């Protein structure tokens, strides 16, 4: 209902304003910025019920992207990284290079305005070679996230998959301090 053509990506922005005039001014400014960038060929302004439809589309997006037919799946191992907005462009570029280095593709999904990234490599975990890639990609992205002083668990907990990377992310001394605190409970 608002997507034109076959885009490589969608970026949805929400603009809030106190008056219709302020809103219109913000929309005109944003559209001009997007057009001047040359990075987008389409822009749609949604109002009314279409806003709710777009939000539902966004909510369904990760499920749709993760529902790949066959043994190749968008796997959860690095899906909760977060970096500062000022580092987002460089982080994504380096992440893309990591994936190219492994000759792999990934699903890119994000709350970009918050720097929260839901990146999922597409792997076949029935193959031992892809299980090894799962581990290598996770390790490389943990190091990349650390390089940008980001969080490897920006929205959710560390869990089984990311727990081993806590010392890397917070340092051995801080990790040992946390272990000592936990031992008291």
Predicted segments with their positions:
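Noncatalytic alpha-helical scaffold of FAD-dependent oxidoreductases
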Residues: 1-111, 115-154, 159-185
């Amino acid at each position: 209902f608002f997507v034109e053509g076959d885009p490589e990506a969608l970026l949805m922005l929400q603009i809030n304003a106190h008056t219709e005039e302020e809103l219109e001014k913000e929309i005109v400014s944003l559209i001009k910025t997007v057009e001047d960038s040359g990075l987008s060929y389409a822009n749609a302004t949604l109002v009314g019920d279409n806003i709710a439809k777009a939000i539902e589309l966004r909510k369904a997006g990760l499920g749709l992207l993760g529902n790949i037919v066959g043994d190749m799946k968008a796997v959860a191992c690095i899906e909760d990284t977060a970096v500062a907005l000022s580092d987002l462009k460089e982080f994504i570029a380096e992440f893309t290079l990591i994936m190219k280095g492994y000759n792999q593709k990934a699903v890119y999904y994000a709350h970009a305005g918050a720097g929260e990234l839901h990146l999922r490599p597409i792997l076949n975990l029935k193959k031992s070679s892809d299980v090894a890639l799962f581990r290598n990609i996770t390790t490389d992205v943990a190091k990349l996230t650390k390089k940008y002083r980001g969080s490897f668990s920006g929205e959710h907990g560390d869990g089984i998959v990311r727990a081993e990377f806590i010392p890397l992310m917070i340092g051995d001394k801080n990790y040992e301090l946390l272990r000592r605190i936990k031992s008291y409970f």
